[in-house]
């Protein structure tokens, strides 16, 4: 034929096989009993109805096949790419079985022609059917309902972009009766954990197994060992991942045949599922992170990760666990013997109870630590310390970056908590006593200690202020010692905290990361942004003082106002001893001492009045005309009106040498008694 190359299709298939052997352009990952095979979805779909039905839309992913196919799946894969099937008398039965289940008709025909007298389907079914009838039963087109149910329940670990909140696959669906033979009869299975039987009645039941249809194999018990994929519930910190980590666990499924149902071949994938689902497990959802579980028991264990509770404690060594299963495994390893185990130094024969102590001791002999910095001479005992050193001192980037805001973190857990709190607004850790939500486990523990247990063990030696954490105390001590260890490399200004230095650096770079969602205005700090939103874009004054009833738009303004009622003025002038509630007021006051000539400060009203004598409060309610000239109430009234110089003669005021200027008034006045009629001048 003109214009055609008959060997073109053969050459293309050969090139695809070479790509498969090199792992090039392979978009399919097949996990068969722990062995990983790379292939092309297009080739798999062309050769197998099994893959064509599931991945006909071209969606990439990975499929987990039964471990029984591990020895012969490579032969089938070679057949897909070369057309040659290496059959022997030893592997013929296994290849035929796999070809039936994966729906590869050409491979089935080759197996039958290789040994036409024996049939795996006939030997296993025990019904006396010839091999041809058994093969036809596998190759015939099932109904749409059967095929949909079959392929919906296959054990797929799809690598898609959407987060998976449910465990795969969920037991309890009737279609899983058709996948039991696909997974195969395994030889061993883990026994159900005894702790699940010892839990409370409302949560001790694991998900009920499905009732599989079909007759049992002759000479075998009515049990199948099915490999399912469930969520890894190891003892560790809660991690809100976009993709659920899956592990393989063996679960025993009891097969209960029904007397009314017809006898079907055990190996058939087209067995119709039962319509009755009596006692099927209903998924339950976590109210905090909306993760779904198959039973209340798993939900109860999962909630402990939000609360940080570890109720199961080893009586021998005191180690605690989230789950009782982990405690039983720990006890099975004979923790008492492990605690009595000693480690001996090979140089000086000194013994240690812990391996880490021995490693630290060996440094005294060798002078070398296992982890060395490549940029300097420092050495470390742990890899995480070396990583932290490289980031802080040598500018190495943090390994885990946030895709939304490009912020980097040392660990994946920190990144996931950051995404949940900052970008999704989730606070996954909930206090069981008051319902308070925290963004981290450490924040929840701090809340419990401070609010419910009143534990503040770290006390300042200067002002007796107590703190829940030692780091907060150390930061507070810098206000007394004047230590400012963080210095700007551009202008040399020093700060007490790294956060303050970061805020200052934005004044040099011009960065304004906090933007208003209502207008185009941007801010360098979050506090000014909140005040801007409260004053510009929120109606009303929702925050009010419970003492005097004054209302405010921003909660920070209310906090400053309450300090005046309490008499708290922590910003003190070093020149004259005046105290102020805000640092801005202190800076404005310092201008008095800087200016020498032609300074006439603006008269300010009295901002707050603290009266310790209750009798003065009653007298203060009287009209000013009824009071005597020398009483304190007239002075207070004059101060509030801002006209002290015009209402009182100069000789009525007591002179103080500490006053730097006669026109400067203290912004607060504490009155304990009436002012005398005559004052010495």
UniProtKB/Swiss-Prot annotation:
Keywords: Activator, Chromosome, DNA-binding, Isopeptide bond, Metal-binding, Nucleus, Repeat, Telomere, Transcription, Transcription regulation, Ubl conjugation, Zinc, Zinc-finger. The keyword Ubl conjugation applies. The keyword Nuclease does not apply. It comes from the Eukaryota. Zn(2+) 2 binds at residues 314, 317, 330, 335. Zn(2+) 6 binds at residues 573, 576, 589, 593. It is found in: Nucleus; Chromosome, Telomere. A zinc finger (C2H2-type) spans 284-306, 343-365, 371-394, 400-423, 429-452, 458-480, 486-508, 514-537, 543-565, 571-593. Disruption phenotype: Deficient mice are born at Mendelian ratios and do not display any obvious growth defects. However, the percentage of MHC-II-positive B cells is reduced in Zbtb48-deficient mice. Residues 121-176, 189-222 are annotated as: Disordered. Interacts with EP300. This is Zinc finger and BTB domain-containing protein 48. It comes from Mus musculus.
């Amino acid at each position: 034929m003109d214009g055609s190359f008959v060997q073109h299709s053969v050459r293309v298939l050969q090139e695809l096989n070479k790509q498969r052997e090199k792992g090039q352009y392979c978009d399919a990952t097949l996990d068969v009993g722990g062995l990983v095979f790379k292939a092309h979805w297009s080739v798999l779909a062309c050769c197998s109805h099994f893959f064509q039905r599931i991945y006909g839309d071209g969606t990439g992913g990975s499929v987990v096949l039964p471990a029984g196919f591990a020895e012969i799946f490579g032969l089938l894969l070679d057949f897909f790419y070369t057309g040659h099937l290496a059959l022997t008398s030893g592997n013929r039965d296994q290849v035929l079985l796999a070809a039936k289940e994966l729906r590869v008709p050409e491979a089935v025909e080759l197996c039958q022609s290789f040994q036409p007298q024996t049939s795996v389907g006939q030997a296993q079914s025990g019904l006396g059917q010839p091999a041809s009838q058994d093969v036809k039963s596998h190759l015939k087109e099932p109904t749409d309902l059967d095929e949909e149910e079959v392929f919906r329940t296959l054990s797929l670990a799809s690598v898609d972009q959407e987060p998976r909140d449910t465990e795969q696959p969920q037991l309890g669906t009737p279609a899983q009766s058709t996948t039991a033979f696909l997974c195969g009869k395994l030889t061993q299975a883990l026994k159900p954990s005894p702790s699940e039987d010892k839990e409370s009645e409302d949560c001790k039941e694991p998900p009920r197994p499905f009732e599989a249809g079909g007759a049992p194999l002759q000479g075998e018990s009515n049990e199948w060992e099915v490999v399912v994929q469930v969520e890894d519930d190891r003892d560790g910190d809660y991690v809100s991942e976009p993709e659920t980590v899956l592990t393989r666990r063996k679960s025993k499924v009891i097969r209960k045949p029904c007397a009314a149902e017809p006898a079907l071949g055990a190996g058939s994938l087209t067995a119709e599922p039962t319509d009755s689902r009596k006692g099927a497990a209903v998924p339950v959802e976590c109210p905090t992170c909306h993760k779904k579980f198959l039973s209340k028991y798993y939900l109860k264990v999962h909630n402990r990760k939000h609360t940080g509770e570890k109720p199961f404690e080893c009586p021998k060594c005191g180690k605690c666990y989230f789950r009782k299963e982990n405690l039983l495994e720990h006890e099975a390893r004979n923790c008492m013997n492990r605690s009595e185990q000693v480690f001996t130094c090979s140089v000086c024969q000194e013994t240690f109870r812990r391996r880490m102590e021995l490693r630290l001791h060996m440094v005294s002999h060798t002078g070398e630590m296992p982890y060395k910095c490549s940029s300097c001479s420092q050495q470390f005992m742990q890899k995480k310390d070396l990583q932290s050193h490289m980031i802080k001192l040598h500018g190495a980037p943090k390994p885990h970056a946030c895709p939304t805001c490009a912020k980097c973190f040392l660990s994946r857990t920190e990144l996931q908590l950051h995404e949940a709190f900052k970008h999704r607004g989730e606070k996954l850790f909930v206090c069981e006593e008051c319902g308070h939500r925290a963004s981290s486990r450490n924040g929840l523990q701090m809340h419990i200690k401070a609010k419910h247990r009143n534990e503040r063990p770290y006390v300042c030696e200067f002002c007796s202020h107590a703190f829940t954490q030692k780091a907060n105390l150390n930061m507070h001590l810098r206000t007394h010692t004047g230590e400012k260890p963080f210095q700007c490399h551009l202008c040399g200004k020093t700060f007490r905290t790294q956060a303050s230095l970061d805020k200052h650096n934005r004044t040099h770079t011009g960065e304004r990361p906090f933007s208003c969602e209502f207008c185009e205005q941007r801010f360098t700090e979050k506090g000014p942004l909140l005040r801007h939103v409260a004053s510009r874009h929120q109606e009303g004054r929702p925050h009010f003082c419970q003492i005097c009833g004054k209302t405010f738009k921003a909660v920070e303004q209310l906090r400053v106002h309450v300090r005046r009622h309490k008499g708290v003025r922590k910003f003190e002038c070093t020149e004259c001893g005046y105290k102020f509630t805000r640092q801005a007021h202190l800076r404005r006051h310092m201008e008095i001492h800087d200016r020498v000539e032609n300074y006439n400060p603006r008269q300010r009203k009295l901002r707050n009045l603290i009266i310790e004598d209750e009798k003065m409060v009653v007298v203060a309610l009287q009209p000013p005309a009824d009071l005597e000239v020398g009483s304190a109430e007239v002075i207070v009234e004059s101060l509030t009106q801002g006209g002290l110089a015009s209402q009182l003669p100069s000789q009525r005021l007591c002179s103080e040498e500490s006053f730097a200027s006669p026109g400067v008034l203290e912004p607060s006045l504490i009155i304990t008694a009436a002012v005398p009629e005559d004052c010495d001048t």
